[in-house]
A protein has these predicted regions:
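Solvent-exposed interaction patches of small proteins and small membrane subunits
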Residues: 1-54
Length: 54
């Protein structure tokens, strides 16, 4: 893998990590289920895109 490709993957993983942390915070703050599910859907989509790239 090239360095550019590695950085791209790292950026995507960092974004996914941020979404997961946001979901944890939402659960702690007892946010609406619909909002949490929307974030989980975004995480799933990001993971699928990452898998296709890899």
């Amino acid at each position: 893998m090239s360095r550019h490709y590695d950085k791209s993957l790292d950026n995507r993983l960092a974004a996914i990590e941020g979404h997961v942390r946001a979901v944890r915070q939402m659960l702690t703050e007892d946010k609406e289920c619909e909002d949490i599910l929307l974030q989980l859907s975004a995480i799933q989509g990001s993971l699928e895109k990452l898998g296709k790239i890899i």
